């Protein structure tokens, strides 16, 4: 699970947080593997050993993504995972999610970024007041059509 606001231990470093949460999940990685995971999630090498309380929201989000990926789950639940990420990091996240999906993982993501969803996911569901009002395959709708559908359902 990757929440919109990742809760990390502020006085631990990024790599210490990753190591801690991996161990809680029964994963005991060496330092090189932990670094590889953080790099794959877009965190800069120079930031690995900085305390998390000095991180931006986007940097904390990258550590949260790394924690989820390190657990090697079959199902990932994401709540606004690109929140706080710059456009490059958001594109990197999309690539990571596509790779996970292609390797057989199921991904359920809540997001208001309908354009990112379209390029990342296979299916789209639109919720309104907690109810699924529209479901479609991403290959069956253009970006403009998706925008129009979203606007139509969000009126009122």
Question: What are the language-model segments listed below?
Answer:
Residues 76-79:
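Catalytic Walker B motif of ABC-type/P-loop ATPase nucleotide-binding domains
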